[in-house]
Amino acid sequence: MNRWARWPLIILIGILGISAVVILSSLASVDYLINIWWFDSLGYGLYYWLRLLYRYIVFGAVTLLFFLIFFLNFWVASRYVGNVPPAPSKFRIAALDRYLNVVRMFRSGSLWVYTPLSLILAVIIALPIFEKWEAFLLYVAGPKTGVPDPVYGKDISYYLFSYPIYTLVQRRLLIAFVLLLVGLVALYLLERRLLARQEQPIPAGARLHLSILILLIFLIETWDYVLQRYELLYSEAHMPLFYGGGFVEMYVIWALIWLTLFFLMGTAFSMIAFIQTRKGLKPLVVFAVGFVLVLGLRYSAFLPATVEKLVVKPNEVSRERDFIVNNIKATLSAYNLNTVQTRDFTPARTAADVASPKVKAQLRNIPVWDGELLDDVYKQLQQLRTYYTFPSVDVARYTVNGMPQQVFLSVRELDYTLIPEAARNWVNEHLSYTHGYGAVMTPASQGGDEPMTWFIKGIPPESEYGFRIEQPGVYIGLGSYTYVIAPNDAGEIDYPKGNSNTMVSYKAEDGVPLSSFLRRILFAYHFGDRNLLFTTKTTPDSKILFRRNLLERIRVLTPFLLLDGDPYAVVTPGKLYWIQDAYTTSEFYPGATPTLWGRDRFNYIRNSVKIVVDAFSGKVEYYVFEPGDPIVRAYSRIYPGVFRNADQMPPELKAQVRYPQDIFEIQMNIYAKYQQTDPEVYYQQEDMWEPAKTFQDRTPVTIKPYYVTLDLIDPSRFDFLLLAPMSPKGRDNLRALALAGSDPPHYGKIIVYNFPKGELIYGPSQIYALINQDTRISEQFTLWDQVGSQVARGKMIILPISNMILYIQPVYLKSATKLKIPELKRIIMSQGQIVVMEPSLEEAYAKLQERIKLEIDRVDKRFAPLLPGSPAGR
């Protein structure tokens, strides 16, 4: 094998060697080793290696591509340097020696110069692509959706997976070839200046090389203009009316893009012809001038503004109709709202009998407790030790005594910061106080002046209603947890018992074994804690448990999933579990209006994944609940074995799955505008909605979706569902009630009950004002305040019961002393202008029923038809 034939092999081996060194040095770092051990302890060792491998495969492949682009072009250019030697008669001996040295440097030494230079440039160009390595995987693995976009007819998967990669690659290729062209032109000019050969023409091969590069640059720029056609689908020029391309974009800008392409290609071929033949300057000038003029029109605001003013504005509805329709359809599809079912709801004048079995069933599950106030009750009555806390209160439904019952549930977690200062030491923090214990559960519905009913209470957990938790330890939760070592010789405090503590030794899958002194050294370095290295309280079975916060654990495992803000606990006969909803999102759904949610911006979202985390062992499992979502299908292909089908979820967990509040809130914010599917109605925005508002402590607040158990989906059964009251934009009355089912077979089904447009349905803020105006209620509040109690009004909920719209607000009393245990005292219930306040839901409903009948009788008597013969009847 000659010297030149060996060079490609040497270069390839060199690149692979450098990549191997980078990978091995990364793996040798402490963080990588700890991650490998941690992922492996959870059963995701192969998945972690795949993520590492994919990352470096993408980086290596892209770097190699750009390296070859740079190196081969530099190498070809070096062949033409000195290809035409200078005439000896015109040069001194010194000049000839200089010429030969330069030629030798660029030819023989070029491999030593161009190889590192090409590698450096390739890495610089490839780095932004490396940061998007997972998008490349989605591009490769993304499936077809079978849904074309209405403008270009391309499958939606093109926009979700291909378009973002094409735009990124196009920009990097353009930068690479422009740098290359500048470098090669400089190289050829350098040769001519060093050798004083300006009178000699550039070699034909060099001209051909430069011509090809120029053509490639023009082709890459042409690709950019082709991609700009699709970019029009993401135009924000017409916001806030509609999103995406409008008349100006799809007719004027679209035509200018094609004209730009025409003149660009004409300029490219004219320039190459001129470089090769020194002829054809006139066509080059014509095409170049045309390109500049059209480009100016393309990016100038003059022509679009003129067309908008003279053509579009006078007939805006007709001109923009098709584009408004495209935006409506795309947005509803992107947010999974294209299958929303609408129903009419006409409120009845009279209330059904409170003795009716159906009314009783509806009242038994109305959540009258406010989660925030209930949290104070749990902490005061069930915290039991200073170091326990209840981070959040969840809404759920369970079967109690054979009947479906909506409940509130909270996990008793450990909070080390609550331990007295004198007891805070390394042993207690990392060896003894390792976990929380058990949970509490109460019914959502309860009467005032009644003692709290506890479905689950105490330590150890006990229940008179059939609930049991065999393993109540909580090592994974919502709190901020430090690392712990378990089991250990110091002993873990399992739960308090009398004046002492019951001890336990941890036995579960979670945790990285501290099986060697080297591991202790590495973990001590990682956590910056030398006590971990020198402690004598470990055993051969000791493991180190870290990343015990639920959200942190999931985000480290699957950073590509967007997490819901409300993970919730599940009680099973065996253990406590957490269920975390996760979303797949994209900001490239064509023509769909984007949403800003926290720091995330997207215009496509699916609640594709339910994540189950064992609160004791820390085991994490992923279940796909949206198998039609192309993004989660792509991830399932990329990471085989990570995602499971929903039917593989254990029945006791699947029974507790619920439709998440965050995505429903996002959907309703979108639907409030895009339920106007008629383009003319949409253009006028005459029926735009917004979430209903009320007052909380005299502060206006938006009512967020809340969970209730009602028969609104199927009249023959009660479903656990989310309810969101909607009002007309800028108004206080109600316009609709939107709901989303959580129980199979109606899971995820969204139904919107529309109220008659011509009928006033009171909104929650109006009911709030009516309550304040009720003299009997105000007098009672004043009386309670005078006896040293504080009156607290809970969140108002709106419920359709027996064809009536009821407004329910609980009233609590809190002691004015430091020890504040909220007590549910009364239930305020209203139907329109009639407001009552009674100790229980049943009593309030009965009282409301009585008041409604009296009001109907009063109105009927006052406006009864006059008797024949009366003075007014003559």
UniProtKB/Swiss-Prot annotation:
Signal peptide, first to last residue: none
Membrane topology: Multi-pass membrane protein
HAMAP family with a match to the protein in the record: UPF0182
Keyword terms, alphabetized: Cell membrane, Membrane, Transmembrane, Transmembrane helix
Protein name (Swiss-Prot/TrEMBL): UPF0182 protein Sfum_2137
Membrane-spanning parts: 7-27, 57-77, 110-130, 171-191, 208-228, 252-272, 283-303
Annotated source species: Syntrophobacter fumaroxidans (strain DSM 10017 / MPOB)
Compartments, as annotated in UniProt: Cell membrane
Main location: membrane
GO cellular component terms given for this protein: extracellular region; plasma membrane
